[in-house]
Amino acid sequence: MNKTAVFFLASALAGCASPAAVEHKHTAEVAAFEDQRPSVEMDRYTAEKLNALLKVRQQAGAQSTGQLSEQISRAFMHTPYAANMLQGSATLAEKLVVDFRGLDCFTYLDYVEALRKSTDQDSFIKNLIQTRYTGDGVHYADRRHFFTDWAHAGQPLTEDLTAQLSADAVTVTKHLNQKANGDLYLPGLPLVDRDITYIPSTSIDEQLLSRLQTGDYIGIYTHLAGLDVTHTGLFINTANGPVLRNASSKKRQREVMDSPFMEYVQNIPGIVVLRTRPDGQAFTPPSAPEIDAQSARQPSQALTHG
């Protein structure tokens, strides 16, 4: 892959970072859990913060999914943004990386979701593998490279609620991993045909906000061929209004921060909404207006191809 392709992938594929991770250049000390298989790449700062977060999780007890997600995600506020934090490719062996020194938008969600379910290091590693990969092992081919993989690949982590939240939801069939010119974003990985449903930004209003819950995972939809979203974050209700809690890659920000939600979504194509299943409970979808499948809006050719 040439340098231009690598740059484009890093900028677009997950918006904040490329799922086609390359070996990052941090030089801090690496610690491994020797009794774990596979071994875990972890620096001392991360190990200490992980232990502190696990204590917080233990003390939280049986809080709701949203409360846990808010509390854990808040602990990462102001963490520097860093791209390409994972190690692995079609030609480079995948390593299980845990690194809290810098986050991109997708690894941020990985850690929040895994920590929410964990009370000790062993359970965290197990949950991180189940969150980041579709199988039980650590393999590049099994990594959840796309945001909607969380709802549609392997054992689903979430429910895709987008179509249920708004009668204005639009569905587009995407050939994930295939650029408009036919090339692949991620060589060595297959194309995935998937219907991606998003809510246009013009349809995001107070009524929709009332159906969103703290802890919902938000993907920023893109019209680009072969991609589902270009950025991700968590929907959080705060005393000052709803925010998108995200690892921002914007030039003057570049850290985990709270972005006012309605301001953020004004100038984007739309959003995809995923919601974690309550642990051990059957999932009950939210009430929403009836949607007539025959009259649901379809995207124009221009929207389909960005």
Which residues are covered by each model-predicted region?
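Sec-dependent N-terminal signal peptides
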Residues: 4-12
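Cationic-aromatic interfacial patches
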Residues: 22-103
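Acidic/His-rich structured neighborhood in mature extracellular/periplasmic domains
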Residues: 79-195, 213, 219-220, 237-240, ...
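Short alpha-helix capping/helix-loop boundary micro-motifs
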Residues: 197-208, 221-222
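Low-complexity, Gly/Ser/Thr/Pro-rich intrinsically disordered linker/tail segments
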Residues: 214-219, 230, 234-306
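Short, charged beta-turn/beta-strand-edge "cap" motif at the junction between a beta-strand
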Residues: 224-226
